[in-house]
From Swiss-Prot:
GO molecular function, one term: host cell surface receptor binding
GO cellular component: host cell cytoplasm; host cell cytoplasmic vesicle; viral envelope; viral outer capsid
Domain of life from the UniProt record: Viruses
The protein's assembly and partners: Homotrimer. Homomultimer. Interacts with host peroxisomal glycolate oxidase (GOX). This interaction mediates its relocation to virus factories peripheral to host peroxisomes.
Name the UniProt record assigns to this protein: Outer capsid protein P8
Organism, scientific name: Rice dwarf virus (isolate Akita) (RDV)
Stretches assigned to coiled coil: none
Family statement drawn from the similarity comment of this UniProt entry: Belongs to the phytoreovirus outer capsid protein P8 family.
Record GO biological process: fusion of virus membrane with host plasma membrane; symbiont entry into host cell
Function: Capsid protein which self-assembles to form the outer icosahedral capsid with a T=13 symmetry, about 70 nm in diameter and consisting of 780 molecules capsid proteins.
Taxonomy of the source species: Viruses, Riboviria, Orthornavirae, Duplornaviricota, Resentoviricetes
Length: 421
């Protein structure tokens, strides 16, 4: 079955999941005869046995999840899904598998619009503001690139040897500096702060700030840039935030933009932080200063030329956020741990990933130097490892990441009701 058919089918499963849990998250009281009939019709579209669903609609869904996990953990059964042709194919796989023949039809005979229309006419008990539960939105990620959502810069900060953590810096910055010109670069919600603390005046002139690895993967849209003396609500000691209208302008440049960008204005700026250093031209002498960049931050691949080169991801290794895909896998991971299958499934996913990468190589073989150090559900860290394979064509690396991304989102959807016997 082609990639698009998988996505369409999983979208239908999302609809069923919402249908049966909308009453109260985990309970099913309030389902009427009409609701059960509509639910039965939806199961029929997937060729799912309806046995047991009247007492608990999760029963057939649990059977489907168990079959899917069995399917995905055997690479000789899900091998078609791991081939390059899977993305563009529109045919039923040549491999025979009970999960596909029993539970998934190669064509959806009822359009998704009709399915959604059924959901809009529920007679379920009260939900003043019906909503799709967050954990059921996983398939939406499978339809998009994994770089499209805003991200908090403080989620990306990672401590390394010789570097103080982000939160511990709060206490340090609140302590008066013991020397002149102590540079810093920190992050909080919606803001990145950088500057120099000092116990004496700092003359006007040029100053350079090295962008750390965790920030080099970011771009910002619609940002205000201004002087401040606050970090997580704590006053930063050794900086001056005051200014007058007569002060000479302070500007800065970033590696991806040669224009002088203004500080302390109403201008809304958009730029990326990848590629090197921030060069700041301080217009007036200050006893220390702190510049805040406040806006909507996204991973560089989203809104910059770096999307086409991904150079920001293949720079200095940095553990970036996993685009929250692990949130959608919480239920499945909990069941794996509860039944003692966590390590077994992890090994199966490692084998699946290696088989997928091998299929993209010519001749088929694992690239030299490939080694994963993160668990399979930490998607961004695995993506970084794949994108760092300099001996593999960049377009191939990007396709592998997209391919693995869709499979991970399918696991989040189909594994939700996994309950091994």
């Amino acid at each position: 079955m082609s990639r698009q058919m998988w996505l369409d089918t999983s979208a239908l499963l999302e609809a069923i999941s919402e249908y049966v849990v909308r009453c109260n998250g985990d309970t099913f009281s309030g389902l009427t005869t009409g609701d059960f009939n509509a639910l039965s019709n939806m199961f029929t579209q997937l060729s799912v046995s309806s046995a047991g669903y009247v007492s608990d609609p999760r029963v057939p869904l649990q059977t489907m999840s168990n079959m899917f996990v069995s399917f995905i953990t055997s690479t000789d059964r899900c091998g078609y899904m791991l081939r390059k042709t899977w993305f563009n194919s529109d045919t039923k796989p040549t491999v025979s598998d009970d999960f596909i023949t029993t539970y998934i039809r190669p064509r959806l005979q009822v359009p998704m619009s009709d399915t959604v229309r059924q959901l809009n006419n529920l007679s379920l008990q009260p939900s003043a503001k019906p909503k799709l539960y967050e954990r059921q939105n996983a398939i939406m990620k499978g339809l998009d690139i994994p770089y499209s959502e805003p991200i908090e810069p403080c989620k990306l900060f990672r401590s390394v040897a010789g570097q103080t953590g982000n939160i511990p810096m709060m206490g340090i910055l609140a302590t008066p500096p013991a020397a002149q010109q102590q540079p810093f670069f920190v992050a909080e919600r919606r803001r990145i702060l950088f500057g120099i603390r000092s116990n004496a005046a700092i003359p006007a002139g040029a100053y350079q700030f090295v962008v750390p690895a965790w920030a080099s993967v970011l771009s910002v849209t619609g940002a205000y840039v201004y002087f401040t003396n606050s970090f997580f609500g704590t006053t930063i000691a050794g900086v001056t935030a005051t200014a007058t209208a007569a002060d000479a302008a302070t500007t800065f440049t970033v590696p991806t933009d040669a224009n002088n960008l203004p500080v302390q204005t109403d201008s809304r700026l958009s730029f990326s932080l990848g590629g090197g250093n921030i060069n700041l031209e301080l217009g007036v002498a200050k006893t220390g200063f702190c510049v805040a960049i406040e806006g909507e931050f996204t991973i560089l691949a989203n809104r910059s030329q770096a999307y086409y080169t991904l150079n920001s991801i293949t720079q200095t290794p940095t553990s970036i956020d996993d685009f929250d895909v692990s949130d959608f896998l919480t239920t499945f991971l909990s069941q794996l741990r509860a039944c003692g299958q966590y390590e077994i499934f992890s090994d199966a996913m490692d084998q699946l990933t290696n088989s997928l990468i091998t299929n993209y190589m010519d001749p088929p073989a694992l690239p030299a130097g490939l080694a994963f150090t993160s668990p399979w559900f930490r998607f961004s860290e695995r993506a970084r490892t794949i994108l760092a394979l300099q001996n593999v064509d960049l377009n191939i690396r990007k396709l592998i990441v997209r391919h693995l991304w869709v499979i991970t989102s399918l696991i989040a959807v189909f594994g939700r009701y996994y309950r091994p016997n």
